[in-house]
Amino acid sequence: MGLHQRYATILGNKTLTLAAPIKDELREELRKKFAKMMSALFKQKGANFDINIIASDEAQDFINTHTSVLDSSFQKVEMSDLMRQRLTRSNYIFSGMKTFHELNEAFPSLLDENGNKKTFERFLNDVRKIDETYNSNYLRAEYNFVQASAEMAAKWEKFMEDGDHYYLQYRTQHDDKVRPEHASLDRVTLPPSDSFWESYYPPNGWNCRCTVVQVLKRKYEPTPHDEAMSLGEEALQTDKKGIFRFNSGKEQKTVPDYNPYTIKRCRDCDIAKGKLNLEKAPVADNQLCEACKLVHKCANAHTYSGKTKLTFEDRDAILAKPLNKQYFTKYTGIKGKVLQHE
């Protein structure tokens, strides 16, 4: 099943109409960066798509802008600096993989029906529909999902401060918009340590509005584990690929490793799990896996403070290091030829 078919299956037009619009200025900025990225793609030579364009300044500028759009969805949500940094990293990787698909889909449009290279104006006009599909239609739903994931990740962080002192209870919004399959999970009550929350912690789908609250143990009886798992399985029966079965707070990610822009085995891949000694680990011989590896390498050179921008020399110095030494929590500067880390 292709990417757009997967999206049609898990998204649907009804969901798109529920998604909140992206601010016009953000959408316009993304549109400009898309055009610049297409200009870089237009200059590529050769008959085959070169994934290294992902690391180009134009593509990185687009990825960073797309990441910023997603980050803006939880700008006012209270959470630790570490959680925010890791959610931003998740947004960057998600944006990078999405960008790979946009570039890969745009590449064949470089040639006309006779096999001749188009003018840039015609090429850009032809790929505008790709921009509209990915960065308007899909982005609206992705923005909402990231916002919900971040809010629930922040909640999970607070839940963990209390450990199993309280039970956690699944709650719906109790209105006519609640999906019947989610309604069955309402009032499921379990300790935070129960594995139920690893698979059925909200959001459990695009535009899912479900939440989880802490409740006193003396007031509620816990739901039997097997019963809760059965209800969860029934609630997500339409999610046959298991795309939404993750805990954003526990994994510290806004989007699961397996999403519309990746493949099923990404859930168990060392790259996706952040095991960064990748030079010793084999990578599947396909463009998606190679793109994922490159996106993670770029993410390791990506700064999260929003205040420091790496020079080209700084970035190259980081990327020249072994992969297991590239990742750092905060870039603080360079003294001589030594990278300074916190």
Each predicted region: which residue ranges?
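N-terminal leader/targeting and assembly helices and adjacent pre-domain segments
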Residues: M1-D131, L216-E342
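A broad, low-specificity signal for short, low-complexity segments enriched in glycine/proline
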Residues: T67-V69, R128-T133, Y166-D176
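Internal glycine-rich, Lys/Arg-flanked active-site/core loops of soluble domains
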Residues: D112, F120-F123, R128-D164
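Conserved short secondary-structure elements within globular domains
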Residues: V146-R218
